[in-house]
């Protein structure tokens, strides 16, 4: 028969008393009033903060965007199909933040920095807020280091510096993404970490870009953030901030690439494209019943982009001179750069590269319209060698454009005008460049020097591209001294000019034979 021992009972009671926790847990809880279209209205949550993360019963995360008198309007970061009216919502007390660190290199993540490439979890070295304040005036330094894109037309006429924000703008299918990807490919071995943010794109397009970067060895220094077209508007809205936060970690903290012991603190960010982010934000704002403004965008759509792009900077020496360069992409409709979003982003950035569909269809690729493309601060970052040859190129091309328009109406042209037109055609031809084939500064300087100094005048226009390719191959293999001279001095020295002239004359002689 079972006997009850008083000492056992007393020890159990004593244990229970000792384990008893008097600590109270206070949770801010609300109730779902209405849910649908990626938006939830929640009653309660009196102490909710703006942009606070909310957790729904089914595990879906939301962000509180509208704080109204009697309810909170939240956007859902998932489908939210199992959220029911009347279910409870818990305020987490946290603002949206993501893990950051070197482990993200070579990975594809979503807008919440969760890996989507099937290569396992990523362990971040620290956590950063998605919305961080941009560096102030004292924390910045003016742009002075070049960020070479490898595209001759850009590096010569619209140079980009580290810490600059240069807009790439044009109609669909004019080569905007190609310029961005070429720039990423050209950073190989140059100590720059790249972040490519794909907003509202097809998953197949993103997969194609990942494959291009992987096959050319660029994925090891690149992070890809993807919020595809089928994902909720909230994730498409957040993706650029996620990419920016990952880039900011590099700018402020620096990191070492695999197989290298050198710490790098320069980052390049591509937002492809901010038009789709603005559309996602408009969708969210209209569903939250915010008043619509021009083109039905909310009144704070300028602030949406300005607070993102102002985070790109060149830091002062006190902060380590890190840099975050931004290449936002904007898609125009029928070349209309005076629409709301294009004008907003043009006014925020330090210059724009305008791509023209007419030029693209005529065979000029990259289809850069040099007339309305500009770099407001990049000139200070251009290397001396490029500056020396680019001035003449820009002037000759401007005169050629004027003459070309005039020559359409004139029947008889004098010899000097004909020679100028012929030179202009050859200059335009050397600026053509195939996809995914960036050139080094030395190669760009060589071909511009050859064209502006008349070395290509006796070559047929159709033969310019083959000549350019063969000459650059010859220069790399037989006159490697020239490349080394440009690389070490960053200037077109007398020695470099002599080597280049000799190489051009020797090569033309062998070609004629």
Swiss-Prot record:
ATP binds at residues 170-177. It comes from the Bacteria. It is an enzyme of class 7 (translocase). The record marks 373 as: Required for activity. It is a peripheral membrane protein. Its EC number is 7.1.2.2. InterPro entries: ATP_synth_asu-like_sf, ATP_synth_asu_C, ATP_synth_asu_C_sf, ATP_synth_F1_a_nt-bd_dom, ATP_synth_F1_asu, ATPase_a/bsu_AS, ATPase_F1/V1/A1_a/bsu_N, ATPase_F1/V1/A1_a/bsu_N_sf. CDD domains: ATP-synt_F1_alpha_C (cd18113), ATP-synt_F1_alpha_N (cd18116), F1-ATPase_alpha_CD (cd01132). One of its GO terms (biological process) is proton motive force-driven ATP synthesis. It is found in: Cell inner membrane. It catalyses: ATP + H2O + 4 H(+)(in) = ADP + phosphate + 5 H(+)(out). Signal peptide: none annotated. Pfam families: ATP-synt_ab, ATP-synt_ab_C, ATP-synt_ab_N. Produces ATP from ADP in the presence of a proton gradient across the membrane. The alpha chain is a regulatory subunit. Belongs to the ATPase alpha/beta chains family. This is ATP synthase subunit alpha. The gene is atpA.
